[in-house]
Regions:
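C-terminal helix-cap and adjacent tail motif
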Residues: 343-376
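Long, low-complexity, charged/polar intrinsically disordered regions in eukaryotic proteins
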Residues: 1-35
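Short conserved catalytic/interaction loops centered on acidic-Pro-aromatic/His motifs
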Residues: 288, 313-341
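Residues forming anionic-ligand binding surfaces in small-molecule and nucleic-acid pockets
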Residues: 147-175, 279-291
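Glycine/small-residue-rich phosphate/adenosyl-binding loop
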Residues: 214-305
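Glycine-rich, charged/polar anion/phosphate-binding loops
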Residues: 5, 13-16, 205-210, 225, ...
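Active-site pocket-lining segments that scaffold enzyme catalytic pockets across diverse folds
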Residues: 183-232
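Long, charge-rich, low-complexity alpha-helical segments
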Residues: 23-26, 33-157, 318
Length: 376
């Protein structure tokens, strides 16, 4: 019997965050907390099923599921691939972090972790993919129509006012003037998109309300600012304090090269004077909604806050952008968050429009021609 350094018998148990699927006639088991995958033959799958709780190696060997000559090597391999945990080793911190999402797992935890740190294809690679495959890949229809149903035409909208103007003017910009934005402009955009406007007396604790909706008023979204060229603010990485309406400096300025790493495939966004990251503190939502569907609330809420951010920037005549193609772990390392309890979900930024340009949707070249829809 194998014993730990303290002389105690070593116990093993199946890892708590495993998802299995058949692929190419092989069962593959994925520990989504550690990101490690392994092919598992039937006899080893049966061995794992015996380890629902801490089990001694002696009892496991006695089950006869694996030939005695291969037993020790099999256990070592399962531990190395993080499919088994040993009682004499410290828990992996990633596993402990994923445990905090327990009531959402495996659905939300698996989706959250397996969609991080994606390798994004360059636009030119996507355009050439159909040619490489020997077939044309046509895009789906841009709109949906019911051809066999009656449609009632609506009156034209009353599109007067500042909000309607901002909604119509909002565009994604990919080129920016070298002029800085002002601290007043940044403060206005942050206050009216992410700042706490009022506190409501709740049964247990005061409840914050912002300009964007949040399921159960949980307001799980946090905002971080990467200030690169703001008149009146030292370059650096800041956390926005929504109640105090202030910026807390948490790290030195990111280099331009580092900022480009944040947005793989969209490096031109790093030229903006300000980049903003929207994260979610999942515990706030979990406290009230212990079912996996509530993970969607975190995604939607980040979108609400970001849209408010973009509209406020547009109303001030600034050039905003938003992007979801992110280098998650690089960003989270620089923000000092673990990516599980609190994770980056979305990014945006603001700059000034380049001189003489009505819209710069492309990193270089002229903007495409625009045809306005006369119905709206």
């Amino acid at each position: 019997m194998e014993r730990s350094a303290r002389g105690r018998a070593v116990l093993v148990r199946r890892a708590q965050h495993l998802v299995a699927q058949w692929r190419d006639r092989t069962l593959r088991v994925h520990n989504y907390a550690t990101g490690i995958k392994a092919e598992v033959p039937p006899e080893v799958c049966e061995l794992l099923s015996r380890c629902d709780d801490w089990t001694s190696l002696t009892d496991l060997a006695g089950a006869g599921l694996v030939p005695p000559s291969a037993f020790s090597a099999t256990i070592r391999k399962l531990v190395r691939f993080t499919l088994l945990e040993r009682s004499d080793r410290r828990p992996d911190p990633r596993v402990s972090a994923v445990d905090t999402l327990r009531s959402w797992n495996p659905q939300a935890g698996f989706f959250h972790l397996t969609t991080k740190d994606v390798r994004f294809a360059a636009p030119q690679a996507l355009r050439s993919a159909p040619a490489r495959n020997g077939a044309e890949r046509r895009p789906p229809a841009a709109i949906k129509r019911y051809t066999n149903r009656r449609t009632t035409d609506l009156p034209r909208p009353d599109a007067h006012g500042e909000l309607a103007s901002a909604l119509r003017a909002r565009r994604t910009w990919r080129r920016y003037s070298q002029k800085p934005i002002t601290l007043d402009e940044l403060a206005t955009v942050l206050a009216l998109s992410a700042g706490i406007q009022v506190w409501v007396k709740g049964a247990d604790i005061p409840i914050p309300l912002k300009t964007s909706p949040s399921g159960g008023a949980r307001h799980a979204t946090e905002v971080y600012v990467v200030a690169q060229n703001v008149d009146g603010l030292k370059p650096g990485i800041y956390h926005y304090a929504p109640a105090r309406h202030g910026l807390t400096r948490i790290a030195r300025a990111a280099s331009k090269a580092r900022a480009r790493e944040y947005v793989p495939g969209s490096e031109y966004f790093a030229d903006a004077p300000v980049m903003v990251f929207f994260t979610s503190v999942f515990a706030r939502i979990l406290w009230r909604y212990p079912y996996a569907r509530a993970y969607r609330a975190a995604l939607i809420e980040a979108g609400h806050v970001c849209q408010s951010f973009l509209l406020m920037a547009t109303s001030l005549g600034l050039a905003p952008f938003s992007v979801m193609a992110l280098a998650d772990s690089i960003i989270e390392d620089d923000l000092g968050i673990d990516g599980i309890r609190e994770s980056v979900l979305y990014a945006a930024g603001i700059g000034r429009p380049p001189r003489g340009v009505a819209w710069a949707p492309l990193a270089r070249g002229r903007a495409p021609k625009v045809r306005r829809n006369p119905r709206v």
